Amino acid sequence: MFAASLCRTCHQISGEGGIAGPDLTQLGNRFSTKDMLEAIISPSKTISDQYGSTVFFLKSGGSVLGRLIRQDNLKYYISQNPFDTQTIKAILKKDVVRTRVSDVSPMLPGMINGLNPDELKDLIAFLKSGGNPAHPAYASSK
């Protein structure tokens, strides 16, 4: 379910998966099932500074949204696509009038909407267990 619901595209568990979002290997040790479900259902409720996006307001009147990867004296380098973190866009600092941290998570809401109750239980068991199939969380997901 972790791969089928696209979680793996952005998140790692036990060293496998994407890097656009936080590593979820220890999630079950830090958060309750309720907290996990809230974070999945409403990802913008709490956004880690590490993984949030920035809005760059341009002199032209437009704006650009992306995760700030790095910057130098002349440019901001941002990733705009959480499914393709290797594609980086450069924005000239001289073209930016201001920036602000976005209050919208790059994680899309409703990622679990297509799961049936058993699939959702399996996903939560996987998250609670850190991907360990022998973890007791699987017994309670049945």
Predicted segments with their positions:
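Gly/Gly-Pro-rich "capping" loops immediately C-terminal to redox-active cysteine motifs
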Residues: G17-I41, S53-V101
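Active-site phosphate-binding and catalytic loops of NTP-dependent enzymes
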Residues: I47-Q50
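Short, solvent-exposed loop/turn and secondary-structure capping segments
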Residues: Q12, A20-D23, H135-S140
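Long, low-complexity intrinsically disordered regions
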Residues: L108-K142
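Extended surface/linker regions that mediate inter-domain or inter-protein docking
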Residues: M1, G52, S63-V64, I69, ...
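Positions in alpha-helical segments
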Residues: P22, S105, P109-G110
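Sequence/structural segment immediately N-terminal to covalent heme-attachment motifs in c-type
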Residues: M1-I13
